[in-house]
Amino acid sequence: MRVTDFSFELPESLIAHYPQPERSRCRLLSLEGPTGALTHGTFTDLLDKLNPGDLLVFNNTRVIPARLFGRKASGGKIEVLVERMLDDKRILAHIRASKAPKPGTELLLGDDESIHATMTARHGALFEVEFNDPRPVLDILNAIGHMPLPPYIDRPDEDADRELYQTVYSEKPGAVAAPTAGLHFDEPLLAALREKGVEMAFVTLHVGAGTFQPVRVDTIEDHIMHSEYAEVPQEVVDAVLVAKVRGNRVIAVGTTSVRSLESAAQAAKSDLIEPFFGDTQIFIYPGYQYKVIDALITNFHLPESTLIMLVSAFAGYQHTMNAYKTAVEQKYRFFSYGDAMFITYNPQAIFERP
Protein backbone atom coordinates (compact mmCIF):
# COMPACT_ATOMS: atom_id res chain seq x y z
CA MET A 1 0.00 0.00 0.00
CA ARG A 2 1.22 3.48 -0.82
CA VAL A 3 1.18 6.42 1.59
CA THR A 4 -0.40 8.57 -1.13
CA ASP A 5 -3.47 6.28 -1.05
CA PHE A 6 -4.36 8.06 2.21
CA SER A 7 -4.15 11.59 0.84
CA PHE A 8 -7.07 14.00 0.59
CA GLU A 9 -7.52 17.70 -0.18
CA LEU A 10 -8.02 19.80 2.94
CA PRO A 11 -8.61 23.56 2.74
CA GLU A 12 -6.50 25.48 5.28
CA SER A 13 -9.70 27.15 6.55
CA LEU A 14 -10.95 23.84 7.99
CA ILE A 15 -8.03 23.43 10.41
CA ALA A 16 -9.31 24.41 13.87
CA HIS A 17 -6.97 26.77 15.74
CA TYR A 18 -9.19 27.06 18.82
CA PRO A 19 -11.70 24.63 20.36
CA GLN A 20 -15.44 25.21 20.53
CA PRO A 21 -16.54 27.39 23.49
CA GLU A 22 -18.27 24.31 24.97
CA ARG A 23 -16.36 21.03 24.77
CA SER A 24 -19.35 18.80 24.00
CA ARG A 25 -20.97 21.12 21.43
CA CYS A 26 -18.67 20.13 18.57
CA ARG A 27 -20.12 18.39 15.53
CA LEU A 28 -20.19 14.60 15.29
CA LEU A 29 -20.01 12.66 12.04
CA SER A 30 -21.18 9.08 12.62
CA LEU A 31 -19.95 6.34 10.29
CA GLU A 32 -21.65 2.96 10.30
CA GLY A 33 -18.73 0.67 9.55
CA PRO A 34 -20.53 -2.25 7.86
CA THR A 35 -22.58 -0.09 5.45
CA GLY A 36 -20.64 3.18 5.20
CA ALA A 37 -23.79 5.16 6.09
CA LEU A 38 -23.10 8.66 7.44
CA THR A 39 -25.18 10.77 9.84
CA HIS A 40 -24.52 14.31 11.03
CA GLY A 41 -25.11 15.57 14.55
CA THR A 42 -23.47 16.97 17.68
CA PHE A 43 -21.20 15.27 20.19
CA THR A 44 -23.91 14.90 22.83
CA ASP A 45 -25.70 12.51 20.42
CA LEU A 46 -23.39 9.90 21.97
CA LEU A 47 -26.03 9.59 24.70
CA ASP A 48 -28.36 8.02 22.13
CA LYS A 49 -25.66 5.93 20.45
CA LEU A 50 -24.33 4.20 23.58
CA ASN A 51 -26.21 1.48 25.46
CA PRO A 52 -26.28 0.69 29.19
CA GLY A 53 -23.36 -1.65 29.87
CA ASP A 54 -21.25 -0.40 26.95
CA LEU A 55 -17.67 0.31 28.06
CA LEU A 56 -15.94 3.59 27.18
CA VAL A 57 -12.14 3.37 27.44
CA PHE A 58 -10.39 6.71 27.94
CA ASN A 59 -6.69 7.68 27.99
CA ASN A 60 -5.98 9.54 31.24
CA THR A 61 -2.56 10.89 30.27
CA ARG A 62 -1.93 14.56 31.06
CA VAL A 63 -0.11 16.92 28.70
CA ILE A 64 3.03 18.46 30.16
CA PRO A 65 4.28 21.97 29.19
CA ALA A 66 6.91 20.28 27.05
CA ARG A 67 8.21 23.11 24.85
CA LEU A 68 11.16 25.08 26.24
CA PHE A 69 13.04 28.02 24.77
CA GLY A 70 16.55 29.18 25.58
CA ARG A 71 20.09 29.14 24.27
CA LYS A 72 23.34 27.29 24.46
CA ALA A 73 25.77 28.85 26.95
CA SER A 74 27.93 29.60 23.90
CA GLY A 75 25.13 31.76 22.48
CA GLY A 76 23.03 29.94 19.85
CA LYS A 77 19.25 29.90 20.30
CA ILE A 78 17.54 26.55 20.90
CA GLU A 79 14.05 25.12 21.17
CA VAL A 80 13.56 21.96 23.23
CA LEU A 81 10.56 19.65 22.87
CA VAL A 82 10.41 17.01 25.60
CA GLU A 83 9.64 13.54 24.23
CA ARG A 84 9.77 11.74 27.58
CA MET A 85 10.63 12.38 31.23
CA LEU A 86 13.26 9.77 32.17
CA ASP A 87 13.34 10.54 35.91
CA ASP A 88 13.24 13.56 38.24
CA LYS A 89 16.37 15.06 36.69
CA ARG A 90 16.52 13.91 33.06
CA ILE A 91 14.48 14.23 29.89
CA LEU A 92 14.70 12.82 26.38
CA ALA A 93 14.01 15.62 23.91
CA HIS A 94 14.07 16.91 20.37
CA ILE A 95 16.33 19.97 20.10
CA ARG A 96 16.05 22.51 17.31
CA ALA A 97 19.18 24.61 16.89
CA SER A 98 21.29 26.04 14.07
CA LYS A 99 23.94 23.53 15.15
CA ALA A 100 23.10 20.41 17.18
CA PRO A 101 24.58 20.55 20.69
CA LYS A 102 27.33 18.06 21.56
CA PRO A 103 27.45 16.06 24.83
CA GLY A 104 28.58 18.34 27.63
CA THR A 105 26.96 21.46 26.12
CA GLU A 106 25.49 23.77 28.77
CA LEU A 107 21.94 25.00 28.12
CA LEU A 108 20.22 28.07 29.59
CA LEU A 109 16.45 27.56 29.50
CA GLY A 110 13.35 29.63 30.22
CA ASP A 111 12.36 33.12 29.14
CA ASP A 112 14.85 34.53 31.67
CA GLU A 113 17.43 31.77 30.99
CA SER A 114 17.46 30.96 34.71
CA ILE A 115 17.33 27.18 34.39
CA HIS A 116 20.66 25.47 33.77
CA ALA A 117 20.88 22.08 32.09
CA THR A 118 23.44 19.90 30.32
CA MET A 119 23.07 17.85 27.15
CA THR A 120 24.62 14.58 28.30
CA ALA A 121 24.08 12.12 25.43
CA ARG A 122 22.50 11.64 22.03
CA HIS A 123 20.20 8.74 21.14
CA GLY A 124 19.52 8.89 17.40
CA ALA A 125 17.32 11.93 16.77
CA LEU A 126 16.80 12.52 20.51
CA PHE A 127 18.96 14.29 23.09
CA GLU A 128 19.32 13.37 26.75
CA VAL A 129 19.26 16.49 28.92
CA GLU A 130 19.96 16.68 32.66
CA PHE A 131 18.73 19.64 34.72
CA ASN A 132 21.09 21.24 37.23
CA ASP A 133 18.24 22.24 39.53
CA PRO A 134 16.97 20.91 42.89
CA ARG A 135 13.35 20.74 41.66
CA PRO A 136 11.87 17.68 39.92
CA VAL A 137 11.63 17.89 36.13
CA LEU A 138 7.83 18.23 36.17
CA ASP A 139 8.01 21.27 38.48
CA ILE A 140 10.56 22.89 36.17
CA LEU A 141 8.39 22.27 33.11
CA ASN A 142 5.32 23.67 34.87
CA ALA A 143 7.33 26.79 35.74
CA ILE A 144 9.00 27.57 32.40
CA GLY A 145 7.44 25.30 29.77
CA HIS A 146 4.97 26.14 27.03
CA MET A 147 2.08 23.90 25.98
CA PRO A 148 3.24 21.91 22.94
CA LEU A 149 0.48 22.78 20.50
CA PRO A 150 0.68 20.73 17.28
CA PRO A 151 2.59 22.28 14.36
CA TYR A 152 -0.61 22.79 12.33
CA ILE A 153 -2.07 25.09 15.02
CA ASP A 154 -0.20 28.08 13.70
CA ARG A 155 -0.16 30.38 16.72
CA PRO A 156 1.76 30.72 20.00
CA ASP A 157 0.34 28.85 22.97
CA GLU A 158 -1.83 30.90 25.33
CA ASP A 159 -2.54 30.55 29.05
CA ALA A 160 -5.99 29.14 28.22
CA ASP A 161 -4.38 26.22 26.38
CA ARG A 162 -3.12 24.83 29.70
CA GLU A 163 -6.74 23.91 30.41
CA LEU A 164 -8.25 23.62 26.93
CA TYR A 165 -5.55 21.30 25.53
CA GLN A 166 -6.22 18.87 28.38
CA THR A 167 -9.02 16.35 28.96
CA VAL A 168 -11.17 16.97 32.04
CA TYR A 169 -10.17 13.52 33.38
CA SER A 170 -6.42 13.81 32.71
CA GLU A 171 -4.47 12.43 35.64
CA LYS A 172 -0.99 11.11 34.82
CA PRO A 173 1.50 13.70 33.47
CA GLY A 174 3.70 12.58 30.59
CA ALA A 175 2.15 13.35 27.19
CA VAL A 176 3.43 15.96 24.76
CA ALA A 177 0.19 15.89 22.78
CA ALA A 178 -3.39 15.57 23.99
CA PRO A 179 -5.47 12.46 23.31
CA THR A 180 -7.78 14.78 21.41
CA ALA A 181 -10.95 12.69 21.08
CA GLY A 182 -11.27 13.05 24.84
CA LEU A 183 -11.27 16.87 24.68
CA HIS A 184 -14.98 16.80 23.77
CA PHE A 185 -16.10 15.21 27.04
CA ASP A 186 -17.18 17.61 29.78
CA GLU A 187 -18.42 16.80 33.28
CA PRO A 188 -22.16 17.10 32.44
CA LEU A 189 -21.80 14.66 29.51
CA LEU A 190 -19.77 12.20 31.59
CA ALA A 191 -22.41 12.39 34.35
CA ALA A 192 -25.23 11.81 31.84
CA LEU A 193 -23.42 8.78 30.39
CA ARG A 194 -22.91 7.31 33.87
CA GLU A 195 -26.58 7.95 34.65
CA LYS A 196 -27.50 5.95 31.55
CA GLY A 197 -25.41 3.01 32.74
CA VAL A 198 -22.44 3.43 30.39
CA GLU A 199 -19.30 2.09 32.06
CA MET A 200 -15.88 3.74 31.98
CA ALA A 201 -12.28 2.57 32.24
CA PHE A 202 -8.95 4.36 31.92
CA VAL A 203 -5.74 3.33 30.19
CA THR A 204 -2.62 5.51 30.00
CA LEU A 205 -0.60 6.19 26.87
CA HIS A 206 1.85 9.08 27.02
CA VAL A 207 1.54 10.54 23.53
CA GLY A 208 4.94 11.42 22.09
CA ALA A 209 5.92 14.09 19.58
CA GLY A 210 6.34 11.27 17.07
CA THR A 211 2.58 11.37 16.61
CA PHE A 212 3.11 14.48 14.43
CA GLN A 213 6.02 13.08 12.41
CA PRO A 214 5.08 12.57 8.75
CA VAL A 215 5.36 9.10 7.24
CA ARG A 216 8.59 9.44 5.25
CA VAL A 217 8.40 6.26 3.16
CA ASP A 218 6.42 5.59 -0.02
CA THR A 219 5.14 2.16 1.01
CA ILE A 220 3.37 2.08 4.38
CA GLU A 221 4.65 -1.41 5.24
CA ASP A 222 8.17 0.12 5.35
CA HIS A 223 7.22 2.68 8.02
CA ILE A 224 8.76 2.23 11.47
CA MET A 225 6.39 3.46 14.17
CA HIS A 226 7.61 5.66 17.03
CA SER A 227 7.60 4.17 20.53
CA GLU A 228 5.26 5.34 23.31
CA TYR A 229 4.72 4.16 26.89
CA ALA A 230 1.34 2.59 27.67
CA GLU A 231 -0.40 1.09 30.70
CA VAL A 232 -3.45 -1.20 30.60
CA PRO A 233 -4.08 -2.21 34.23
CA GLN A 234 -5.93 -5.28 35.48
CA GLU A 235 -9.15 -3.36 36.19
CA VAL A 236 -9.36 -2.32 32.53
CA VAL A 237 -8.78 -5.91 31.39
CA ASP A 238 -11.53 -7.09 33.75
CA ALA A 239 -13.95 -4.42 32.50
CA VAL A 240 -13.27 -5.36 28.86
CA LEU A 241 -13.75 -9.09 29.45
CA VAL A 242 -16.97 -8.57 31.44
CA ALA A 243 -18.40 -6.25 28.76
CA LYS A 244 -17.62 -8.83 26.06
CA VAL A 245 -19.28 -11.65 28.05
CA ARG A 246 -22.37 -9.46 28.56
CA GLY A 247 -22.59 -8.79 24.83
CA ASN A 248 -21.82 -5.09 25.25
CA ARG A 249 -19.43 -3.04 23.14
CA VAL A 250 -15.94 -1.81 23.97
CA ILE A 251 -15.67 1.76 22.66
CA ALA A 252 -12.24 3.38 22.45
CA VAL A 253 -12.08 7.12 23.04
CA GLY A 254 -9.30 8.08 20.66
CA THR A 255 -6.63 6.29 18.68
CA THR A 256 -4.32 6.21 21.73
CA SER A 257 -6.88 4.11 23.62
CA VAL A 258 -7.12 1.86 20.55
CA ARG A 259 -3.36 1.41 20.43
CA SER A 260 -3.19 0.71 24.18
CA LEU A 261 -5.93 -1.93 24.14
CA GLU A 262 -4.74 -3.60 20.95
CA SER A 263 -1.14 -3.66 22.28
CA ALA A 264 -2.40 -5.44 25.40
CA ALA A 265 -4.34 -7.89 23.23
CA GLN A 266 -1.32 -8.55 20.99
CA ALA A 267 0.89 -9.28 24.00
CA ALA A 268 -1.69 -11.51 25.75
CA LYS A 269 -0.55 -15.12 26.19
CA SER A 270 -3.84 -16.90 26.94
CA ASP A 271 -6.81 -14.54 27.22
CA LEU A 272 -8.29 -12.03 24.75
CA ILE A 273 -6.47 -9.24 26.60
CA GLU A 274 -4.09 -9.13 29.55
CA PRO A 275 -2.49 -6.30 31.57
CA PHE A 276 0.20 -4.38 29.69
CA PHE A 277 2.88 -2.02 31.02
CA GLY A 278 5.60 -0.95 28.62
CA ASP A 279 6.55 0.66 25.34
CA THR A 280 4.44 0.00 22.27
CA GLN A 281 5.26 0.53 18.61
CA ILE A 282 2.00 -0.94 17.32
CA PHE A 283 1.23 0.25 13.79
CA ILE A 284 -2.34 -0.39 12.65
CA TYR A 285 -3.14 -0.17 8.94
CA PRO A 286 -5.52 -1.93 6.52
CA GLY A 287 -5.29 -5.69 6.89
CA TYR A 288 -4.95 -5.50 10.68
CA GLN A 289 -7.30 -7.79 12.62
CA TYR A 290 -8.83 -5.80 15.49
CA LYS A 291 -9.15 -7.90 18.62
CA VAL A 292 -10.89 -5.73 21.23
CA ILE A 293 -12.55 -2.60 19.84
CA ASP A 294 -16.19 -2.51 18.68
CA ALA A 295 -16.55 1.26 18.17
CA LEU A 296 -14.28 4.27 18.04
CA ILE A 297 -14.59 7.96 18.90
CA THR A 298 -11.91 9.99 17.15
CA ASN A 299 -11.11 13.38 15.63
CA PHE A 300 -10.33 14.01 11.95
CA HIS A 301 -6.70 13.21 11.16
CA LEU A 302 -3.99 14.50 8.84
CA PRO A 303 -3.74 13.27 5.25
CA GLU A 304 -1.23 10.42 4.86
CA SER A 305 -0.93 10.01 8.66
CA THR A 306 -0.69 6.71 10.53
CA LEU A 307 -3.96 7.65 12.26
CA ILE A 308 -6.09 7.82 9.10
CA MET A 309 -4.56 4.41 8.28
CA LEU A 310 -5.72 3.12 11.68
CA VAL A 311 -9.26 4.39 11.03
CA SER A 312 -9.24 2.83 7.54
CA ALA A 313 -8.31 -0.52 9.07
CA PHE A 314 -11.31 -0.19 11.39
CA ALA A 315 -14.08 1.14 9.13
CA GLY A 316 -12.75 0.06 5.72
CA TYR A 317 -10.67 2.14 3.32
CA GLN A 318 -13.49 3.24 0.97
CA HIS A 319 -15.89 4.09 3.81
CA THR A 320 -13.20 6.11 5.60
CA MET A 321 -12.06 8.11 2.57
CA ASN A 322 -15.68 8.79 1.60
CA ALA A 323 -16.40 10.01 5.15
CA TYR A 324 -13.42 12.39 4.96
CA LYS A 325 -14.54 13.68 1.56
CA THR A 326 -18.00 14.34 3.02
CA ALA A 327 -16.51 16.02 6.10
CA VAL A 328 -14.56 18.44 3.90
CA GLU A 329 -17.66 19.18 1.79
CA GLN A 330 -19.73 19.78 4.95
CA LYS A 331 -16.98 21.96 6.44
CA TYR A 332 -16.26 19.94 9.57
CA ARG A 333 -13.36 21.29 11.63
CA PHE A 334 -10.19 19.19 11.48
CA PHE A 335 -7.40 18.00 13.77
CA SER A 336 -6.76 18.46 17.51
CA TYR A 337 -9.22 21.28 18.27
CA GLY A 338 -11.70 20.15 15.61
CA ASP A 339 -14.85 18.01 15.39
CA ALA A 340 -15.27 14.28 16.04
CA MET A 341 -16.39 10.99 14.51
CA PHE A 342 -18.23 8.01 15.99
CA ILE A 343 -17.39 4.85 14.04
CA THR A 344 -18.65 1.29 14.40
CA TYR A 345 -16.48 -1.64 13.34
CA ASN A 346 -16.58 -3.02 9.82
CA PRO A 347 -15.67 -6.75 9.96
CA GLN A 348 -14.99 -6.70 6.20
CA ALA A 349 -12.31 -3.99 6.58
CA ILE A 350 -9.59 -6.60 7.08
CA PHE A 351 -10.07 -7.80 3.48
CA GLU A 352 -10.04 -4.33 1.92
CA ARG A 353 -7.01 -2.54 0.48
CA PRO A 354 -6.75 0.78 -1.38
Curated annotation (Swiss-Prot):
One of its GO terms (cellular component) is cytoplasm. Pathway: tRNA modification; tRNA-queuosine biosynthesis. One of its GO terms (molecular function) is S-adenosylmethionine:tRNA ribosyltransferase-isomerase activity. It is found in: Cytoplasm. Its main location: cytoplasm. Pfam families: Queuosine_synth. Its EC number is 2.4.99.17. It is an enzyme of class 2 (transferase). Keywords: Cytoplasm, Queuosine biosynthesis, S-adenosyl-L-methionine, Transferase. The keyword S-adenosyl-L-methionine applies. It catalyses: 7-aminomethyl-7-carbaguanosine(34) in tRNA + S-adenosyl-L-methionine = epoxyqueuosine(34) in tRNA + adenine + L-methionine + 2 H(+). The keyword S-adenosyl-L-methionine applies. SUPFAM superfamilies: QueA-like. GO terms for biological process: queuosine biosynthetic process; tRNA wobble guanine modification. Belongs to the QueA family. NCBIfam families: PRK00147.1, queA. Monomer. Transfers and isomerizes the ribose moiety from AdoMet to the 7-aminomethyl group of 7-deazaguanine (preQ1-tRNA) to give epoxyqueuosine (oQ-tRNA). This is S-adenosylmethionine:tRNA ribosyltransferase-isomerase. It comes from Salmonella newport (strain SL254).
